[in-house]
C-alpha cells in the first residue's frame, strides 16, 4: 500500500510519498520520450487524425520492471489536462502497452492542436507522476481543406512537347499582402508538383530542408508540409515567394529523357493567419500571383546538376517592396480529384552536417580537386575568388584512381554544377535543386592568380532527417570501419525514399535492396517512419492484379516485376512488425500482401513459379558472361518458387496476428504444398540441386525459408558448408543470398564460419572493400582494387547499401539479441562469442528502451554484461559450446534462472565447454 499526504501552505505545496514496497516507482519517475505515430515528437502538420501514442518510463533509480496499467489524457488546451480533458481521458487501462496505443477520443480535425500526457502504474500498482505535456498539431488532412490553386509560370503551360528550358528552368513566384492586425498565429501549408523553396519577407523558411516535399506516387498522393511563420509576418506589407523546380516530378528521371516526364512543375500554398481577435485571413496561390523564369538558377536537375548565373540575380525579389512589374502572370491548374493531398508521413531531407576537406591537389593553374575523405551525399558550398564572366565548374566523383577523376559510374548523369560570376571578387554559391553522391569535388574556373585553400569549400551532408544510433563497437578496427561504412551508406541512400544509389542516372527506390536492408537499418537508426512511408507508396503503386513494381515510386523505365523484389509487399511489413510490435503496419498492408500472393499464383504452374527475376543479383564468379552474368547462377525458377513460399508464410503469420484464422489455414496449406513442390522440382533424392547450378544461395533459400523436411535440414546445411569450404570459405552470394548467410550458418551451429566470412580479407568479402579504400559499401564485391582500378562495368556504384545487410548480424549475432515476440516484448539474448574478437558492445533499440550488451574475452572465457529495459522480458541463452559459471544482478547477487529476466543489469561469466577444447 502507498500512503500519500498532501499539506497546503501559502507559498508552496509539498507532497510526501511513502512507499511500503521495495519494488515501486519512486516519486520523481514519470513517462518520457512521448511520441505519436512512427516516432514524431510534438509534430507540426501531423498526418494521422487518430494518432497512436508511445512513451518510455524514466525509472533508472527505481526497482520497477513492468507496466501494469496506463492513463492517457488529451485536451484542446494544456490547462484542460488539469481540469477537464475535453478530447479524451482513457482512465486507467490495465495493459502493459507503452507503444502504438490508439487514440479513442473525440474527432481531431485539420489544423487542430491538442495536448496530451500519460502516466503508468508498475507491477505493484504504484502510479508514476504524470509526464510533461506533449502536443500534436494537425496538418490539412483532406483535399477539401485546400482553398488554394495550383499555379505556375504562364510560359510553362502544358504542351505535348515542352522544351527542356520549360521543364528544367526553375520558376520564381511571388505575391504581396497586407496585415493590419496583431498576429496571434500563422501557418503556411505548402507543397509542389516538383520541389520548392519558400520565402516570407526575404526569409528562407525552407533553409534547412532539401528538395521538399520529396517523392511519392504523384498521381496517387502528394505530400504537404506545414511551417510556423508567426514571427515572420509584419504588421504592414508582406511578400510570399517561392522557387519551384522539376525534382522527381518532371524532366529527367533515371536515364529517361526530359520529354518522358513532360508535365511542368506547379506550386500550391495556403497561408492561414489568425489574429489576436481570433479572426482569420487566407493568402493562397491563385491567379493574382506573378511569375518569371528569368531568375539566376538557369537549369536544375537531380541528375545533371545546376547552372547558376549571377547576372540574373534579382535582389530582394521575395521582399514586399520589390518591383515585379516585368514579371508575367501565372496560370492555374485544376486539382486532380484522384490525387490525395496529405501531410508528410516522415521528416524531409535536411542539411544535417558539414564536412571540410581533408586535403586538396591543384592539377592545373585554375583547377583543383578537394578530397573530403568520405563518400557522401549532398551539395557543396563554395566561397572562392572568381573573375567576371569566367564560369566556375564543379564536378563530382566518388573516387580517384592514381589521381584520375572517376565518373564512368555516373553513366549519363552529368552531375555538374556551374556558376557564372557577375563581377570579380569572392563568390558564394550553394546549389539548391540538385544533389550529388561524391567524395571528391573538382573546381575549375576560379581566379588563377589565387592559390587554393581548404576553406574554399565545405560539403553539406544531406539525408532524410533520421536519428542515427551509432550503437556498435568492437575490438576489430576493420569491423568498426565496416559498421561506419554501412552507416554512411544508410545516410546517403535514405534520401526521402530508400535509393539504390545516390550518384548515377538511376537513384530509384528498388524493392529488392529494401528487402535486404530494412532490418539492419531499423537496428541502426530511427527509420520506422521512413519505411512506413515507403511501404505506403508501395501499396499505392501496386496494381489491381497484385503486381508490385521493381522500384517505388514507379516511373516507366522497367515495366516488369521480379521475385525477391516485389516480395517487399510481404517482407517489409513483417520485418517492421517484428521490430516495432505496431500492428497497424500489418493492418494497412494485409490486403496488399494477399494481392501479391495472388499475383505470385498467377505466375506459377503446379506450384512452380516462372516469374521473372533479377536472380541472385551480382553474385561473384558467375558462369555466364556479359549482362546475363549479373543475375547469378542460381536457377530462376528455384528463386521465384522459394520467394513465393516465403511470401505465403509471412502472409499466413500476418493473418494469425490479425485474427483472420480461415485465411491462415488456407495459407498454411499453400505453404506446405509449395514446400513439397520446391523439394521435388529442384533437388534429387540426395538433395543435390538438379535445376541450374548448385549454389550457396540455392541451399540458403531452402534453409532460410523452411522449404525442406526437418529430416533433411542437416544434409542441406552440410552441402552449404561444403560449398563454402570449396570456395576457400568465401561467399558466392548476391543480393538475395547474402542477407540469409549469417543467420543460416548460425542456425547450423557454425558461427565460426560466419566470423571467418566476416573477417575475410580477400575478394569477395566485406573487408576487401575496406582494404581498397572504401568509405561506404559498394554495389559489387569487386567495384575497385588498388591494383586493377575500377570495375569496367558502368553499373558500379560505390555507395550501395544492399551488402550492408551483414550489419543485422552485428546485433542479432555478435551481440546476440533477437525479438522472440513482436516489438521485443520478449527477447532472446545469445551473443556469439569468438576468440577472434576481444570485445564487442552495442545497444539494440526497442519500443521500450535499449537492450545493452557487451562482452569481453578473459583468460579463461568471456564476461558478458546485459541490460534489460523496463517492460521487456529476456532470456539469456549461452551460445553453443559455452557454459555459464557465474551470473549476478546489479547488486552482485547470484541469479540461477536466465529465463524471464526483468528490467535490470546482469553479468554472466562463461567458459568454453571442456569437450570443445577452446574458443572458436
From Swiss-Prot:
It comes from the Bacteria. It holds the Pfam family Bac_rhamnosid6H. It is a lipid-anchor. The active site is at 506 (proton donor), 779 (proton acceptor). PROSITE patterns: PROKAR_LIPOPROTEIN. GO terms for cellular component: plasma membrane. It is found in: Cell membrane. Keywords: Cell membrane, Hydrolase, Lipoprotein, Membrane, Palmitate, Signal. It is an enzyme of class 3 (hydrolase). A lipid is attached at residue 20 (S-diacylglycerol cysteine). PANTHER family: ALPHA-RHAMNOSIDASE (EUROFUNG), ALPHA-RHAMNOSIDASE (EUROFUNG)-RELATED. This is Alpha-L-rhamnosidase. It comes from Alteromonas sp. (strain LOR).
